[in-house]
Regions:
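Positively charged n-region of N-terminal signal peptides that target proteins for export
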Residues: 1-4
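C-terminal motif of bacterial Sec signal peptides marking the signal peptidase cleavage site
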Residues: 14-17
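Buried hydrophobic residues that stabilize the cores of well-folded domains
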Residues: 20-274
């Protein structure tokens, strides 16, 4: 009996070992390395994204545009000369998320570099829910003036998705499909009421905590102000190849009063690399 009991135990251990070996391994997806956005036959931007050996963003290079290097020192990421008029943008990290951002510009009166905009981000867990902003501008005779916005950005979540972004009296609502957002696809609800352009798919978006769980289906912009009758609608279409989103189309319609709708169709192509 002892012999059979021993053999039975060996069989159980073997089965448990096989169970551990059979656990599915989630493959690491390649990183977004190229984005091309066009409208009709016109290329709006063509961007290469380069990475360091430890998978950090090394630079974002726009063909016929800025080449933007990233510098890493301790918990700070610095984006150099991201656009005309901005000397650099500094991001402070806590763990894997951005907790504040400082936009630095040159003072035209004394050439001093100053913080023109400071954003402090608020999270619930790893989900971004809001940001405050301190805006500063130089005075011709010296010194600075500033203004604080406690609720510069507000994000509302439902079922793992950002369904509403608000700023003052402006609103943009999002609806989602049942398709899941791949972990390497950096689309994000950005603080904009015209969500087109490179910023919606910048890899920096992956540093703002949880992305929306699902891919967007549509978005609608409107204002609660009686002085602003502009509305806009956006429809999203995605093409997937295996685990990767290889293209995205955004159909934009902008309405203002009784004028005919302004229509645009933006086509994005995505390339990935290890």
């Amino acid at each position: 009996m002892k012999k059979y009991a021993f053999l039975f135990m060996i069989m159980i251990i073997g089965l448990l070992s096989c169970g551990d070996d059979d656990k599915p391994v989630v493959p690491k997806l390649d990183k977004l390395s190229q984005v091309i956005c066009s409208e009709g036959t016109d290329v709006i931007f063509f961007t290469y994204i380069n990475y360091t050996s430890d998978d950090k963003i090394a630079s974002i290079d726009f063909v016929k545009g800025n080449k933007i290097p990233f510098i890493y020192v301790d918990k700070m990421i610095t984006m150099m000369n991201p656009e005309d008029g901005i000397e650099r943008i500094e991001y402070n990290m806590q763990g894997s998320v951005i907790i504040d951002k400082s936009v630095k510009k040159d003072n035209p009166y004394n050439k001093e570099v100053y913080i023109s905009d400071r954003y402090d981000y608020t999270y619930t867990g790893s989900s971004l829910i809001g940001a405050s902003r301190i805006m500063k501008w130089p005075k011709e005779k010296g010194g600075y003036e500033s203004q604080t916005f406690d609720k510069e950005e507000t994000y509302s979540w439902e079922n793992g998705n950002i369904i509403l972004f608000t700023q003052d009296k402006k609103r943009i609502e999002y609806k989602y499909s049942t398709d899941l957002t791949p972990s390497n696809f950096p689309w994000r609800v950005i603080p904009s009421f015209r969500p087109v352009g490179f910023d919606i798919v910048s890899p920096v978006n992956l540093l703002y905590g949880n992305p929306s769980r699902n891919l967007p289906e549509s978005a609608t912009f409107y204002s609660l102000s009686e002085d602003d009758d502009t509305t806009a609608s956006y429809k999203y279409h995605f093409t997937t190849t295996g685990d990767y989103i290889t293209s995205m189309t955004i159909e934009e319609q902008i309405y203002s009063g009784e004028q005919a709708a302004e229509q645009h169709t933006y086509n994005y192509l995505f390339t990935y690399s290890k």
